[in-house]
């Protein structure tokens, strides 16, 4: 088994197929289902619980206690995660890091046609909170390491897996940041593979494209304040501050920003 198989797995796990699945695919489906159906929202879920479930599967596959490191803080006990390592043969080669986040965006049952925390296969697709962002990738990475371990495969460089929390919410405990600041030894690597890319399948389910993200969007926030001479609301003036502000916002909404090529996009 080569690292190409790991990347191909990321492509194959997109739309669900109705055909009979192999035993190894069924094992992945079971892992994926368990992870998706574990509530990891900030309000009522637990990334720590999800990490423990994935850790238990890794250990059952043959990973030792020393190969799996759990982390959480006393202030945020439910927002923990894990780092696991599959040791390679070349001790001079720096590891690769597989990164995925376990937390998901809030999901209110009344807003969903289906239960957001029950994995449903329908019309060739999986439905539930986190099926794509980012539990598909977390499940793929975990399953890949399990398969490698069970087959006895040892890569040249070690492979590290980091399952973290806090990606979806700005003010939440950020597991990836905490690891970088407090346990850089756990995630030290030559390079990392994270979410942001994507794949494409043809009509028969064959992978035909693997896209890679090479940049991240950024934002700019502006505070707009409009004033006008005071007066009583019973006698509104034509130059009302609210009208002027709404007109400005409308202009921004109607503006089409030009397409800009950066050195990165030009290279591709």
Which sequence ranges carry the predicted segments?
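Acidic-enriched catalytic cores of C-N bond-cleaving enzymes acting on peptides and small amides
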Residues: 184-191, 198-206, 213-221, 233-268
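Acidic/His- and Gly-rich active-site-bordering loop/insert found
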Residues: 19-131, 138, 148-157
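Sec-dependent signal peptide recognition
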Residues: 1-9
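N-terminal signal peptide c-region/cleavage motif recognized by signal peptidases
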Residues: 13-15
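Acidic/histidine-rich catalytic neighborhood of metal-dependent amide-processing enzymes
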Residues: 125-126, 130-211
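Short Gly/Pro-enriched turn/cap motifs at secondary-structure boundaries
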Residues: 72-75, 168, 212-217
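Short, solvent-exposed loop/turn segments at the edges of secondary structure
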Residues: 4, 77-79, 93, 114, ...
């Amino acid at each position: 088994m080569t690292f190409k198989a790991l990347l191909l797995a990321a492509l194959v796990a997109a739309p669900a197929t109705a055909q009979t699945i192999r035993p190894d695919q069924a094992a992945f489906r079971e892992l994926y289902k368990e992870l998706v159906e574990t509530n990891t929202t900030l309000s009522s879920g637990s990334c720590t619980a999800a990490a423990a479930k994935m850790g238990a599967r890794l250990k059952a596959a043959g990973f030792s206690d020393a190969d799996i490191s759990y982390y959480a803080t006393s202030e945020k006990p439910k927002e923990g995660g894990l780092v696991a390592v599959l040791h390679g043969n070349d001790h001079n080669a720096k590891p690769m890091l597989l990164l995925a986040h376990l937390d998901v965006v809030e999901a209110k049952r009344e807003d969903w046609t289906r239960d957001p925390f029950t994995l449903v296969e329908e019309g060739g697709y999986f439905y539930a909170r986190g099926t794509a962002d980012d539990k598909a990738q977390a499940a793929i990475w975990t399953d890949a390491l399990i398969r490698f371990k069970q087959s006895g495969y040892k890569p040249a460089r070690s492979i590290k897996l980091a399952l973290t929390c806090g990606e979806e919410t700005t003010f939440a405990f950020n597991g990836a940041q905490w690891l970088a600041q407090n346990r850089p030894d756990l995630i030290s690597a030559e390079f990392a593979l994270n979410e942001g890319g994507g794949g494409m399948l043809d009509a028969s389910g064959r992978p035909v494209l693997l896209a890679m993200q090479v940049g991240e969007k950024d934002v700019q926030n502006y505070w707009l304040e409009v004033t006008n001479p005071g007066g009583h609301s019973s006698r509104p003036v034509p130059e009302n501050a609210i009208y002027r502000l709404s007109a400005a916002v409308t202009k921004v909404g109607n503006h089409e920003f030009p397409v800009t090529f950066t050195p990165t996009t030009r290279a591709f």
